[in-house]
Amino acid sequence: MGEIDMNEDVYVLGIETSCDETAAAVVKNGKEIVSNVVASQMESHRRFGGVVPEIASRHHVEQITLVIEEAMQRAGVSFSNLDAVAVTAGPGLVGALLVGVNAAKALAFAHGLPLVGVHHIAGHIYANQLVAEMKFPLLALVVSGGHTELIYMEEHGKFTVIGETRDDAAGEAYDKVARALGLPYPGGPHIDRLAHEGEPVIDLPRAWLEEGSYDFSFSGLKSAVLNTLHNAKQRGEEIDPKHMAASFQESVVDVLVTKTVQAAKQYRVRQVLLAGGVAANRGLRSALQDKMKELPGVELVIPPLSLCTDNAAMIAAAGTVLYWQGKRSDLALNANPGLPLV
């Protein structure tokens, strides 16, 4: 089922609680946001330098009902107007996922609505459907805290992972380097900001891996940054964090963008999508826009910042496609922290 054309309006409530955002949204026809509510827990986790699963779960329990009520209220719809409830079933933190899954199951049961379990990464990809029509075949570069993947799609709901990280995800590397530079959590936005003030004058490695591979590796780069900082400290030298941020970011972005464009050429895609939390990175967005000039016939879609980070509108969008395809979950749906995409 490639191109989807539905004449009747479909309203789907999306619920997302995979990490540290409690989110709910109502989306019409898989592409029009009617409401989109996100309650972030960033302040609660900042002092720990990362997401604490137990704290995340407790916050989700406190927020979930309020967030869903607000999404329904802002959308001006009642449960009788909905066609389905879509929820992130995985991957993510198991305790966090369970809050959303249980809320979705309760609502689906109480209101007699179909339940649709959604893969979190499929959600990130379908965030792009909220800003542009998806054209197949396409290639999605998914870059987030836990994932760095190149995904080829021939049609709706059909995913082929052609490249993935062999060690650290790009977002993980950002957070670890940010910590080494003494920057607050989450590290990505801080490194991105600093990188624009500095120059990439420090020589850092780029892991291209073997010929023809679209996989990624960032642990060597992360180690090189930590070693460079450590050695400078031992010598009593000062390394300007701005220049280190610029050098690190250039190394990450160069590999991501080059491999994406190479894969887009090889797979002869019509469209390239950027997705995931790190897609909010200005350096990555502008470098990909520049590099895509090599492929004048291929459309590049980059979602607005609000749709890059975790949200429920993307889950509702992906859930609508599954709903149209007749795919449903039953009330035995469980949270799966290691849920595979394919």
From Swiss-Prot:
It catalyses: L-threonylcarbamoyladenylate + adenosine(37) in tRNA = N(6)-L-threonylcarbamoyladenosine(37) in tRNA + AMP + H(+). Its EC number is 2.3.1.234. GO terms for molecular function: iron ion binding; N(6)-L-threonylcarbamoyladenine synthase activity. Keywords: Acyltransferase, Cytoplasm, Iron, Metal-binding, Transferase, tRNA processing. Binds 1 Fe(2+) ion per subunit. Gene3D superfamilies: 3.30.420.40. Its cofactor is Fe(2+). It is an enzyme of class 2 (transferase). It is found in: Cytoplasm. PROSITE patterns: GLYCOPROTEASE. Fe cation binds at residues 120, 124, 310. The keyword Ribonucleoprotein does not apply. InterPro entries: ATPase_NBD (IPR043129), Gcp-like_dom (IPR000905), KAE1/TsaD (IPR017861), Peptidase_M22_CS (IPR017860), TsaD (IPR022450). GO terms for biological process: tRNA threonylcarbamoyladenosine modification. It comes from the Bacteria. One of its GO terms (cellular component) is cytoplasm. CDD domains: ASKHA_NBD_TsaD_bac (cd24133). Coiled coil: none annotated. It holds the Pfam family TsaD. PANTHER family: TRNA N6-ADENOSINE THREONYLCARBAMOYLTRANSFERASE, TRNA N6-ADENOSINE THREONYLCARBAMOYLTRANSFERASE, MITOCHONDRIAL. HAMAP family: TsaD. Belongs to the KAE1 / TsaD family. This is tRNA N6-adenosine threonylcarbamoyltransferase. The lineage of its organism: Bacteria, Bacillati, Bacillota, Bacilli, Bacillales. The gene is tsaD.
